[in-house]
């Protein structure tokens, strides 16, 4: 527990102990999900339930981003910030499942189970939340997320598009240019970044979590 500070109950998830390097368990994985947007340039944080050096580094970046004591230990101050950043369905406050799935209501029909597609979208939202904060807390426009095979075919998507796995998001221009979005995404755990200069991506920036890095947005210096 947190010593004299009482644990705060939260509608999505409540941590009941301080976490630091060496800890393992489901509560570590819940923390990692929310830190997945803070792996550092080109990094991807493993959601492996094990609090290792990479998790500590991601936590330090999160703490620094929000003006917390950057000690790499998750205690009440860190948890209170996370509680403030999440809604009761565990999505970050500035993104919704509905935004990430304009195809159907149940996440079915893709290349993975509905539960996996929905979870992948959740992780993407936490990455986008980190990216949004880094860009001055201005809105990020989501134009496409999960697609079933039928929805993907209807829009002419690639046959093995990451949208079919629920871990791809297309972003439109808004307060930030498409290039600014593509450039910033390099810091937030996306292995796939496609933007202006890549064929078919002149009107959006695509980010995803493919198995190995592929970044291509030549008009943006990527």
Where are each of the predicted segments found?
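Surface-exposed patches in mature extracellular/periplasmic domains of secreted proteins
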Residues: 42-48, 70-74, 136-146, 190-198
């Amino acid at each position: 527990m947190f010593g004299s500070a009482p644990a705060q109950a939260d509608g999505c998830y409540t941590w009941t102990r301080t976490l630091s390097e060496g800890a393992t368990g489901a509560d570590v994985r819940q923390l990692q999900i929310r830190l997945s947007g803070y792996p550092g340039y080109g990094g991807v944080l493993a959601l492996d339930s094990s609090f290792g050096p990479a998790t500590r580094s991601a936590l330090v970046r999160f703490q620094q981003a929000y003006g917390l004591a950057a000690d790499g230990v998750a205690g009440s101050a860190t948890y209170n910030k996370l509680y403030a950043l999440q809604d009761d369905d565990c999505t970050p406050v500035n993104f919704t499942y509905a935004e990430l799935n304009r195809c159907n209501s149940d996440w079915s029909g893709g290349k993975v189970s509905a539960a996996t597609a929905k979870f992948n979208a959740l992780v993407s939202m936490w990455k986008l939340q980190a990216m949004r904060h880094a860009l001055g807390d201005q809105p990020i426009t989501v134009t496409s997320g999960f697609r079933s095979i039928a929805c993907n075919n209807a829009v002419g998507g690639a046959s093995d598009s990451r949208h079919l796995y629920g871990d791809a998001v297309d972003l439109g221009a808004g307060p930030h240019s498409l290039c600014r979005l593509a450039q910033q995404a390099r810091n937030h755990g996306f292995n796939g970044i496609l933007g202006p200069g890549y064929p078919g991506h002149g009107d959006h920036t695509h980010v995803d979590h493919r198995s190995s890095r592929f970044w291509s947005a030549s008009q943006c210096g990527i």
